[in-house]
Amino acid sequence: MKVKLQIATAEDVSSLVALRTAVNAHLIAQYGKGHWASGSTEKGVLFAMKRGTVYVAKEGQNAIATLTLSTRKPWAIDTKYFGASKRPLYLTSMEVSPDRQRKGLGRQCLDEARRIAREWPADSIRLDAYDAAAGAGEFYRKCGFREVGRAIYRNAPLIYFEMLV
């Protein structure tokens, strides 16, 4: 399946909540509760839509993947670790339906994020990931992101990643 990301609208909110809830339940079932185990609400999705641009990949009316890009630096990211990018975008969240994970959909979403960043125009994509069993650090490395630093957030190790576009 070739993924097509589109900007999420208010009509997508309930489907995005369902997707994020399924991903959260999957992570808890695999790794137990942790910093990654946060609930999702319509209010939270609408807030994400105000602070950034939420993209969604759908099958029919159901969200199967989503990611959020923003020009706003998340407060947990320390820019001293990153390069001299003049126009960074921040990947602030990404979820893929548990039944679609490990099938290339996440990589396709990041390829689309890279394309979107070039058109924005941005010169890099920055993100953080937990350095824990539930973290996606290895996935981001395999997709071409470069580790640029590490920090502790809420007593959990974070890895900062950057990709020049």
What are the roles of these predicted feature ranges?
Residues M1-S14:
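Conserved N-terminal entry element of GNAT/NAT acetyltransferase domains
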Residues G52-L67:
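Conserved beta-hairpin
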Residues R107, E119, D131-G149, A156-P157:
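Conserved active-site alpha-helix within GNAT-family acetyltransferase domains
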Residues T66-S93, Q101:
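Conserved acyl-donor/pantetheine-binding loop and adjacent beta-alpha core of acyl/acetyltransferases
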Residues L110, A117-A129:
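Conserved GNAT acetyl-CoA-binding A-motif
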Residues V17, T21-G44:
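Conserved GNAT-fold acetyl-CoA-binding loop/helix
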Residues G44-V56, K73-P74, Y90:
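A short helix-loop-beta-strand connector motif used in the catalytic cores of GNAT acetyltransferases and
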Residues V96, R102-R115, E138-K142:
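Conserved acetyl-CoA-binding loop-helix of GNAT-fold acetyltransferases
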